[in-house]
Amino acid sequence: CSYCMSPNSKIDRKALVMRNNPIIYSVDSLSSLSVGNGGFAYTVDFTGLQTFPDKYKKGIPLGTQSQWGWHSFANDKNFRFEETLKEYDFGRGRKELYSVQFDEPGRQHEAANWFRINPHRLHLGIVGLELPEAKPEDVKNIRQMLNMWQGIITGNFNINNVSYEVKTTCHPNRDEIAIQIKAKGMKPAVNFRFPYPTGEHSDDACNWNADDKHATTVVRTTENSAVLKRELDSTVYFVQLQWENEAELKEKSTHYFVLQSAADQLNFTCCFSPTYPEDENSTTEQSIAAAADYWHRFWENGAAVDFSQCTDPRAKELERRVVLSQYLTAIQCSASTPPQETGLTYNSWYGKFHLEMIWWHQAHFALWNRPQMPEKTLPWYHKVEPVARAIAQRQGFDGVRWMKMTDPSGREAPSSVGSFLVWQQPHLIYLAELIYRANSQTDEQKKILNAYYPLVEETAEFMYSFASYDKEKDRYVLKGLIPAQETLKASETVNPPFELSYWHFAMETAQKWRERKGEKRVAEWDTLIHKLSPLAYNEEGLYLAAESAPQTYEDIRFTSDHMAVLGALGILPSNRLINETYMRNTLHWVWDNWNWDKTWGWDYPMTAMNATRLGEPEKAVSALLMDKRTNTYLTNGHNYQDERLRIYLPGNGGLLTAIALMCAGWDGCTTPNPGFPKDGRWDVKWENFSQMP
């Protein structure tokens, strides 16, 4: 799969990006646009600011979020994490302690809830036009564009006979927005409003009815700047405002400040920081230039794929999704902590992140030859390693057990589902391997090997100790877990197919890392690799949701949610556990019969990767563009799921990973563009992908 284009047909990357810039012409609560830098994002309405947050609350909320902005409500009842633990016996000769939710009212129920809700991610503040009398319906002549090539949103609109022109960008290296406003016949004003958190599962994190629970004070002012200090219980952060025209900042009411310009133009920057800001903000022009430079380099480096020569009518939409997904994951999924499923736009699961999703959020970066993006995040695993080791020890396992739903501290969020998942475990090994492969320089590879070898080793130690030896059948089994297909129960599940295949791949990869380090392979690990149970199937030659689910095809519970069996060959390379004929049979059955209404955004790229590895490119393309609700991609490129999850970044990341596989293939694949039909309609041009394993 070394297929690539000749040098004289280089992709025009600027044209590729620019033709897919989203343009907004109307008030639509699902068409918010964002600027960001990977660890901070600012989401705006059609005004280029957060002028009408209520209108967007149930759409894509107008968030200002960061990797560092977290808050906990006071723990008045002194809940201890130990109060969330419950004993389970999964037949491993001991009791194991898991952090779970409790249905029955009482202290344990309250403790579990407290640890689920806290800490939660903060909305750092609304920055909007001050238009007290205006309503969204009053707006005319909207034309707003996100220029992804420069990382800037430009827009024009008319409200109450005043024409506005607004530019919005985010500094690439500071959590700072830069805004330029021109108003014909009006002196523009901007408001800065600060909410208290809600502690709700999925929302904009803005409680406007708790003014007495937090404080916003002006701690420094100059002629053209001010620093605001925010205090919410034990959380403190700062907001530094700097303006470039004659203007005055006034406190309108508690937590509500207005910057009023003296002329028809207002240029200002607003920097959010967890510590007192020692330096001045950049100027708006400096920020615009820094963002443009960053985004030019982003688009000029790494992989690119151009569908403009394809004659299949679906190609244009596929290209749009691919370009927008690169932008969205770059601004929201590349920080020093893992991303939440709704990124830095609005809270889902209280703003916490899910480690079983990190592969979907970040694997594509390495395959698109942007390994520096996940390299920002992986050091976090070092930081929380002691917490993960304590989980493994508490349950009687070796090594480290990576948590499922967590926060920057690595503390588990109690969950009666999440605490029993294990497919987050091998992700660390897979991501480290992809980063290693994406760096071709020996020195770089050595650095990566030294940095992540201890984590790879400890991750594999847990995986080995988690597998149970079945003496009677002389094999290793996986049990006492909830698989990626979460409709199965921990107490019943034995040998789910995706986890078996992942154990095989990750343990073999861990051995490879030992060899690269000059260490011997671990003999016991090799025994596990050779004696892992093959995937269970029925008499029709269809793979089961688990060996313990012989009734897979008679019970809708087993044919809903993620069709994780397809991930066993797709996300992962082929191995001795898999019979490709049975896998093909399973793909065809899933295609025709699955409960597609109960799927998630990454199920479509997972299906596409499975079809690609099975040599069914028409199915691969059709999977990516299947007309289902959870495969909807909005004007701004966000992957809409349902009323709760209006955006879903694992879907965007999965799409990019699937495209990498469909273009560049995998180790040993010799078919050019293996994921695209050879019918003359898919003349796909690409550059600089890495192959998948």
Walk through the language-model features, giving the residues of each.
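Acidic/polar, glycine-enriched structural segments that form the non-catalytic walls/loops
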Residues: 4-352, 371, 381-389, 518
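Structural recognition of the beta-strand scaffold that forms the well-ordered cores
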Residues: 34, 41-44, 329, 372-376, ...
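Primarily short, surface-exposed interaction patches in extracytoplasmic proteins
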Residues: 306-315, 319, 337-351, 437-447, ...
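Active-site core of glycosidic bond-cleaving carbohydrate-active enzymes
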Residues: 50, 54-55, 354-390, 408-411, ...
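A conserved hydrophobic secondary-structure block that centers on an alpha-helix together
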Residues: 159-167, 171-177, 198, 434, ...
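Acidic/histidine-rich catalytic neighborhood
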Residues: 458, 462-513
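Acidic/His metal-coordination segments adjacent to aromatic residues that form catalytic metal sites
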Residues: 338-352, 402-418, 479-496, 630-645
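Catalytic cores of secreted or luminal carbohydrate-active enzymes
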Residues: 109-138, 650-691
